[in-house]
Amino acid sequence: MILDNVNFPSDLKGLNMSQLKQLADELRLKTVNSVAQTGGHLGAGLGVVELSCALHYVFNAPYDRLIWDVGHQAYPHKILTGRKNQITTIRQANGLSGFTKRSESEYDPFGAGHSSTSISAALGMAVAKKGKKGRYNNIAVIGDGAMSAGMAFEALNNAGALDDKFYKNNRLIVILNDNDMSIAPPTGAFSNYLSRLASSKSYLKIRDFSKKLIHKLPNAIGKYPRKFEKAAKDWWMGGNIFEELGFYYIGVVDGHNLDVLVPILQNIRDNKSPDPILIHIATEKGRGYNDIIKSSDKLHAVAKFDPKTGEQFKSKSTRPSYSEVFGRKLSILAKNDKKIHAITAAMPSGTGLDIFAKEYPDRIFDVGIAEQHAVTFAAGMSCENIKPYVAIYSTFLQRAYDQIVHDVAIQKLPVRFCIDRAGFVGADGATHAGSFDIAYLINLPNFILMAPSNGQELVKMLNTSNQIDQNPCAIRYPRGECENNINYDDEEILEIGKAKIIKKGSEVAILSYGAILSNVIAAVEQLKQKNIAPTVVDMRFAKPFDKKLVNNLVKDHKVMITIEEGAIGGFGSILVNYLHDEGLVEKYNLRLRSLFMTDKFIDHDSQQNMQKKSNLDADSIVNIIEKLTK
């Protein structure tokens, strides 16, 4: 096994082409067997096995900077860069991250998790090296899906417009990994031949000589040779937007053919042309394993599985997820209300909107990885008396904050935000945790914020949201399952800002916001043994919250605790400010405590352990209440 002797990229340098191909086969098998034990993102990594081998064979990481966009596809890269023996700990507590991470390895020069950041980061690294001795390659590997985000094109536009002096001892190389063939198909052997020719030293030398000569000509004369060069290359290679943005374009290249990939990368490495380069490669997501596991999302994320049969070991549960409840109930509402439309940013199945899409394919819009556009697109729809429901993960909604403020809140447009994966998300760690949505929405005028404590409450809140026509509103709910026996025919509409008392008690009042209520209920059961019987309130609304109820509670309770699975600055902060502003803390000698996510980024772990690290689990709640009542 060649892979047994490969621990770092330097171990690849002495391999011949036959050995490199064998290494790729072994690396693919290692990736499959590793993910089979842990679950994780499989398809993207299998699609870049040959590319990973070629990049580490040709370039000199970490001296050369290699940045993987998103990071889903970085598993083979991790195996080749000193983490082979830890790969079966990926996405496990105290194990490797499922994404690239600077603190994990010097071979991960830039952390990822969200998409479309790689070109900007690589360009920043390239520009920062201006004037330094040596020659550096800064390589961004980005998928065609990530290219749908505006940020990627902002970076391309900036990179192509920069003066050549910024690239004197640097090279910016963008590798567009087209694994869905959504941009352009390769045209076979002739395309590969042209790509090798276009990257060759002789071609680029002639091109650079011509370029220098053209720049010395008067514009009136020089414009014709410039046009001729572009026209000639367009004829042979196919003109495209990347050339227009100032990149030298090579492609489309077979991303699984090392006989083609390696020479092209070597040509680029050895050439000193200052132009930024974009290499367009075609790969197959799930390469070598798609025929075993049949998956609509091309093995994007899988549970633990049998590597021989592809059977996934998913726990069988009859309980629906919050995402499923959302998708089903929205479909029911849409049956009687043709104004309802749904919007997702490349996550139809993750958000439950695949259910809606089956019923109403003409009333759902998947805008791609373009959260900013999604929000303003929804704002425009609402101007025309449509009811847009924007379903986005909490962590990705962060990317559209200016649009939420400027295009929705200020104009008081009734866009409905359905915020999935709110709170801790487990194995995907800090980059995907839904930590900040309460805090970044609660300070916006005109917004109504809701959070269900269970699946049936989500049904009621969707009913309620459909009746909110004068304000924007948001419903946040967690990753995971809710209770059985959801009554989807429930038509109850909640009174805006009205909380619900779950249990009447004395001395201690617990004000819970969202699904964290289940931990509160578990804590209250434990407190019975200690003769402590708190009042438990499901707040339902963080904005506006039930001030009348709060005012009554402070009169006959000595301790008030708020709890939410969100960052500091959320519901608890607003409530504490209110109580102090109204003078109620001093008047009733009230003891206050706000429980929320700890003020640090928590690495991947189980959702339960992450809650425990923030003192949001039942045992921690019990301990805190005991201390406050002594």
Feature roles, as predicted:
Residues 1-79, 243-261, 275, 280-283:
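N-terminal amphipathic, basic-rich helices that act as targeting or association modules
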Residues 138, 142-159, 352, 364, ...:
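Extended, hydrophobic alpha-helical segments in both membrane/secreted and soluble proteins
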Residues 29-131, 157:
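Long, structured ligand/cofactor-binding scaffold of large enzymes
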Residues 36, 48-57, 121-126, 150-167, ...:
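Short alpha-helical segments and helix-capping/turn motifs at coil-helix boundaries
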Residues 304-308, 442-487:
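Helix-enriched interaction subdomains in cytosolic or periplasmic regions
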Residues 8-13, 32-40, 104-111, 246-251, ...:
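Glycine- and acidic
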Residues 81-83, 89-121, 131-135, 162-298, ...:
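Thiamine diphosphate
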Residues 38-40, 64-67, 110-111, 133-149, ...:
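A short, small-residue-rich loop immediately preceding and capping a beta-strand
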